[in-house]
């Protein structure tokens, strides 16, 4: 790196300047207030942890996204967090160790080795909420509602909500007797909706024809909520786990349609995001014109097992930077203020303190500084009036 480009940041790493930084902070405060009103307690996990704790129960994807380094104190491998969800699960299972439903929220920068998608960020500001200790539709619906309220607070509309359920695939794969390698291959094909490949793969399995047909049907079971009725027909005879999963999706979809009729629902039974750690309903939110998911979430009941407690859990996460960018709200103009001259008069200092206590933005001049009040971003000044009192006047 030469002297002329020392200012360059690594690809995918951003800094927030005025007024964007102000908008991000405003949105952050609004979201934390929202979560507080819903009963979610704020936690602040560390930026770095030992790798075995940081990657617990998350699969290989998060491992690849995690920057790793060696602890100079003991030689153990550490990771810079790429996702705060496992950290919050550790806090619930080990640090808090409560027996009642626990609602936690979090917000902070995470770091990725590679961006998600073209020109994506490697340093998102992750925002999320998790509900531990309840296994049922009420907590699933609450999580989705809070995610949708998050969008509302940040001014993001025109939401598409995609619903799925990993237990349907797990049950059908178990019926077919798939090995771990077979399951991984089929999983990849389903994500690509590669129906000819799926059919050829299934035809090579030593499984009953009706079992293979049900797995093949997964690749086509996507669309509006009518897909759930079609799934009941095509997956008939698949077993109680599949029926229960379809019932759960129907109940969740009904609740969302009733409470948020403006949200457009899409059901995709082959969408298996987070398959390696999710255990039930999964969901993602999209907006037109944005190729990546805006938020994701779902049920993951086993993630706390290695920390000593496998509590039921569901939650969601999103990126604050993306929310602000998609909000459609113009960035506020630079805040204006009151300029106070560089004068040691105690009465001036008292006037400045009084104005600041009322929430005014007051910039105190510095002896010998260049630039006038307007150059300092001020539209008013503190000046002596005819009675030698310090008063605020417009420029």
From Swiss-Prot:
Q: Which segments of the protein form a coiled coil according to its record?
A: none
Query: What superkingdom does the record give?
Result: Bacteria
Q: Which Pfam family would be a valid example here?
A: tRNA-synt_His
Query: Which one GO biological process term can you cite for this protein?
Result: L-histidine biosynthetic process
InterPro entries the record matches: aa-tRNA-synth_II/BPL/LPL, HisRS-like_core, HisRS/HisZ, HisZ
Q: Tell me the CDD domains matching this sequence.
A: HisRS-like_core (cd00773)
Query: What pathway is it annotated to?
Result: Amino-acid biosynthesis; L-histidine biosynthesis; L-histidine from 5-phospho-alpha-D-ribose 1-diphosphate: step 1/9
The main location class comes to cytoplasm
Tell me the compartments it is located in: Cytoplasm
Q: Which GO terms describe its cellular component?
A: cytoplasm
Q: Any extra detail in the entry?
A: This function is generally fulfilled by the C-terminal part of HisG, which is missing in some bacteria such as this one.
Oligomer status and interactors: Heteromultimer composed of HisG and HisZ subunits.
Q: What is this protein called?
A: ATP phosphoribosyltransferase regulatory subunit
